[in-house]
Amino acid sequence: AEVNPPEAFNQDVDTYLKIFRNGRYPLDKMAVICSQTGFKLDK
């Protein structure tokens, strides 16, 4: 399913982290979302 960040990301960070950690969300897009929202991913 397609997602529409950053609004949806702000509403459900946990879901996005699960998607990201499962490798279903491109790293470059995740980096953009993080920069837009100020959210930091743990290494």
From Swiss-Prot:
UniProt KW Disulfide bond keyword: yes
A GO MF label: serine-type endopeptidase inhibitor activity
Keyword field: Disulfide bond, Protease inhibitor, Serine protease inhibitor
Domain of life: Eukaryota
Family as reported in the entry's similarity comment: Belongs to the protease inhibitor I13 (potato type I serine protease inhibitor) family.
Subunit structure: Heterodimer of an A chain and a B chain, linked by a disulfide bond.
Role this protein plays: Inhibitor of chymotrypsin.
Protein's UniProt name: Cytin chain A
Lineage, broadest ranks: Eukaryota, Metazoa, Spiralia, Lophotrochozoa, Annelida
